[in-house]
């Protein structure tokens, strides 16, 4: 169990470090119009695009951007969901209000809501982070709300209230240690979901400026050239997106099984 957690934490820290450090080591991606649409070679591992830019360097830069935005979005979403779970269990009225908000947001078309929020916040990384946070919180909040409700009935929370602590503070102090594993796993499972939605947003032309390389944007731009035989334009961005999503999804499932096994024992 401990080894699995160490591996997982190492994976997350590695992604964070890579997303922050890698862009500083990528040389400036200049236009080389004389080398447009070059096929993969030793000079250009994954070829060049219609403006002569190195597809490999752009893909690495796009992946780093997606990981940075995705990690920030997942963290803010998790913190917001945790806050609502604690707040919702502070009183019966707040519980019903949070439940109503969850049901309302889950009833809305997910991608459409994400697009509308992105349009409201603008075209930069912060806009995507806010849009993702305000559209992806319901399911994690739903899980944490029920877990916190069970903890709220425990003796130590009731005793803390009897000794003068507010219910909100009692749940913060005694509840989080018991749901921390579920919270972390929820974030890990949410991360690939967020990455896919960020890619979908940028594929449709929302979110970041066109000058910022993104995996979804590169896939969208490659559409017009794929039918002409320039297959490499969409290969690497697509492979990188699929790989990172599969790795994170597998890590999340593995940790879920470990926690379930540990709880049953």
Predicted regions and their residues:
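Non-cytoplasmic
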Residues: 115, 124, 129, 133, ...
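C-terminal transmembrane helix and the adjacent membrane-cytosol boundary/short C-terminal tail
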Residues: 135, 181, 188-189, 230-265
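N-terminal signal-anchor/first transmembrane alpha helix
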Residues: 1-30, 179, 242, 246
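Transmembrane-helix boundary motif in ABC transporter permease subunits
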Residues: 22-25, 66-103, 114-115
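Transmembrane alpha-helices
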Residues: 64-80, 168-200
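Generic hydrophobic transmembrane alpha-helix motif, especially the helices
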Residues: 45, 49, 89, 95-150
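Short helix-to-coil transition segments within interhelical loops
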Residues: 48-53, 91, 159-178, 219
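Membrane-cytosol interface at the C-terminal ends of specific transmembrane alpha-helices
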Residues: 74, 123-172, 182-191
């Amino acid at each position: 169990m401990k080894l699995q957690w160490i591996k997982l934490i190492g994976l997350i820290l590695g992604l964070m470090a890579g997303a922050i450090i890698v862009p500083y080591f990528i040389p400036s991606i200049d236009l080389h119009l004389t080398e447009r649409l070059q096929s993969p070679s030793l000079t250009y591992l994954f070829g060049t695009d219609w403006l002569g830019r190195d597809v490999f360097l752009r893909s690495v830069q796009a992946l780093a951007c997606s990981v940075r935005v995705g990690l920030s979005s997942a963290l803010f979403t998790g913190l917001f969901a945790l806050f609502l779970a604690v707040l919702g269990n502070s009183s019966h009225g707040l519980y019903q209000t949070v439940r109503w908000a969850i049901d309302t947001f889950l009833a809305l078309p997910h991608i459409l809501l994400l697009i509308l929020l992105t349009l409201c916040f603008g075209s930069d990384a912060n806009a995507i982070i806010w849009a993702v946070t305000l559209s992806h919180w319901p399911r994690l909040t739903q899980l944490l709300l029920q877990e916190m409700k069970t903890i709220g009935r425990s003796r130590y929370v009731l005793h803390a209230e009897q000794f003068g602590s507010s219910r909100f503070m009692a749940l913060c102090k005694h509840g989080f240690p018991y749901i921390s594993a579920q919270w972390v796993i929820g974030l890990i499972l949410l991360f690939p979901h967020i990455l896919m939605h960020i890619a979908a947003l940028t594929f449709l032309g929302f979110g970041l400026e066109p000058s910022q390389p993104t995996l979804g944007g590169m896939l969208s731009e490659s559409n017009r050239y794929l039918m002409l035989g320039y297959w490499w334009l969409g290969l690497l961005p697509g492979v990188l997106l699929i790989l990172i999503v599969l790795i994170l999804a597998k890590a999340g499932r593995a940790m879920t099984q470990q926690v379930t096994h540990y709880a049953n024992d």
